[in-house]
Amino acid sequence: MEKTFIMLKPDAVQRGLVGQIIARFEAKGCKLVGMKLMSVDQALAEQHYAEHKGKSFFEPTVQYIMSSPVVAMVWEGKNVVALARELMGATNPANANPGSIRGSFGMDISRNVIHGSDSVASAEREIALYFRPEELCDYRKAGEEWLSE
């Protein structure tokens, strides 16, 4: 089953939005298989955003993600990477669907409350950065048979 990495950024944690955001993933039938509240250090932040090194927003993004705890999560489900992207909405909340997570809670492009993997390959890389294999739970979720054929 496909997995994706989701991070609730410092603004989501500080604004008390964690429960509301998790509820949206659960309501769509996604299965939570890993979660931790954590502080991101410089090395991890730089690894996470390595593809943006050299861009003007790299350093401010690294500093921001280290500024307060984040909630790192792994969700599992059918086409969960694409589903999560749809739930999150456009990166810039000004362009996001009003019903999406960013459309509902995001303040601006840098305070957009959530990060999600943009592909299966990115999900695998990001999950490996934040979780050891034994930290992910493999279980049968009650009611799974009602979610898809």
Swiss-Prot record:
List the catalysed reactions: a 2'-deoxyribonucleoside 5'-diphosphate + ATP = a 2'-deoxyribonucleoside 5'-triphosphate + ADP; a ribonucleoside 5'-diphosphate + ATP = a ribonucleoside 5'-triphosphate + ADP
Enzyme class, first EC level, given as a word: transferase
Q: Which GO terms describe its biological process?
A: CTP biosynthetic process; GTP biosynthetic process; UTP biosynthetic process
Under the heading SMART domains, the entry gives:
NDK
Q: Which residues form the active site?
A: 115
- Requisite cofactors: Mg(2+)
The protein's UniProt keywords, in alphabetical order, are: ATP-binding, Cytoplasm, Kinase, Magnesium, Metal-binding, Nucleotide metabolism, Nucleotide-binding, Phosphoprotein, Transferase
Q: Which GO terms describe its cellular component?
A: cytoplasm
Binding positions (ATP)? 9, 57, 85, 91, 102, 112
* Domain of life per record: Bacteria
* Annotated Pfam families: NDK
Q: What is its EC number?
A: 2.7.4.6
Where does this polypeptide localize?
Cytoplasm
What role does this protein play?
Major role in the synthesis of nucleoside triphosphates other than ATP. The ATP gamma phosphate is transferred to the NDP beta phosphate via a ping-pong mechanism, using a phosphorylated active-site intermediate.
Q: Which HAMAP family match?
A: NDP_kinase
Give the family from UniProt.
Answer: Belongs to the NDK family.
Describe its assembly. Homotetramer.
Protein name per UniProt: Nucleoside diphosphate kinase
Organism taxonomic ancestry? Bacteria, Bacillati, Bacillota, Clostridia, Eubacteriales
